[in-house]
Amino acid sequence: LGAGTWEEEHPVTSRDTGKGGESGSKARALQKARVLSGMRPTGRMHIGNYFGALANWVRLQNEVLPSSGVASQAGAQHAGPPQRKEAAGQPVYECFYFIADWHSLTSDFADTSGIAGNSIEMMTDYLAGGLDPAKSVLFLQSLVPEHAELHLLLSMVTPLGWLERVPTYKEALENIKHKDLHNYGFLGYPVLQCADIVMYGGSGMRLIVPTGEDQVSHVETSREIVRRFNTFFGLEVDLEGLRKNKAAMESFKNHLPSLRGASTEDIESAYRANSKAAAMEWGIRNFLDKMEASKEYFSYSEKLTEPESMLTKTPRVPGLDGRKMSKSYGNTIMLSESDADIRAKTKVMVTDPARKRRTDPGNPDVCPVYDWHKLFSTKETLDWAAQGCRTAGIGCIECKAKMADHLIAWITPVRERRVEFERHPARVLEVIDNGSKRARNVAQGTMARVREAVFGWERKRKVVASGE
């Protein structure tokens, strides 16, 4: 795992967009929205992965506008779904889900032999778990090279201190001793992650990252990087007009102390050196408001879209030993697990330590088996398990067996879909290739816009052409 990573256990993936007030909320609700999330390719997925991320992805993919044309809340706490007057049955979100294979290199560069195979295994589970290439764009990060180009450009404007202060970066350096994490790729992980996200923003379209509360700070880092990029390359001034308006020029200089002694001949270089720094310090909107008389000579356009977090509720999925479910702990149930293995593994699950003897009553609220009952069992079985535990009316072995029955019933259709894709691995590769082409079409449009904002080649070509 890395700093701000697309992780094995949960996706990354913010605060409000900053466009306050009721009118701002209504305006956002009318916008179309894209959803973006991904995972590092760690191979086959376990049920913790499913309920921690994949289940929410499938839900967002399948959400459609009802007959009123107003979408339901979909469980979001920050970025709610867009409310649009469109035909019933239309998807609420345009979903992009990917496998972050480049991110694996930040911590596992010493051995890359398993990345391709793990990526295929993970995509197979994406499909078995319910993601539909007809409804979502499913792609592989490394097949969209524009991610690397945008990462490069964003890295040029990202202060080193922003990356060094990321909490998970410091934690990883302190806690992960078996890997060498002192490399640029690991430090710059949040910048690549930002590129992954904002690549799929569009004009007039909200960009949403489903995330848990512990991952919101990662999206906020992306928002900070985007604001800085937009300030450098989205803030323009009409210098010719400003020079002709003495009052506006004086207003401009008075708000930037470093410009007060500058002559009009020096104003262009002085502007470039100071005004964008002021806009970064004050915030772009405050900066424009402070300009007062000179405000009309400034323009601002967002070259990249600031992402928003969609806080998603995820159920507790403890591992077989009661700790967080993780492959590294060996306490998982895979989506591909056989019935026999499920029964064997669940038979030795930890339970409420108070139930040392069959006759000892327990507390289902502290029992991992009961947590799993809440995921897979019917209400009738859930009530039976809770009552039996509290009264010692049932034993833990009996409770585990009943839970395993419901788990097997739930996992069987997922496993059957997986087996079908395993028989035809070329179909999985086809999904990856086709989805990556679709993602790249969007990415190429983004990069054309970004390149022009940074370098201005099209503007320069027009100037050259007009002078011939």
Regions found by a protein language model. Give the residues of each.
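Intrinsic disorder/low-complexity segments
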Residues: 1-31, 65-90, 462-468
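Flexible, glycine/proline-enriched loop segments at strand-loop-helix junctions
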Residues: 173-182, 204-216, 331-333
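Conserved nucleotide- and phosphate/pyrophosphate-binding catalytic cores
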Residues: 6, 72, 217, 223-467
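Short helix-capping/linker segments at secondary-structure and domain boundaries
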Residues: 65, 158-164, 199-208, 377-385, ...
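Extended, compositionally biased low-complexity polar/Lys-Gly-rich tracts
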Residues: 87-114, 211-212, 300-328
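N-terminal Rossmann-like or analogous alpha/beta NTP/dinucleotide-binding catalytic cores
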Residues: 13-15, 29-36, 41-65, 85-197, ...
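Aromatic- and glycine-enriched pocket-lining scaffold segments that form the walls
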Residues: 191-195, 199-227
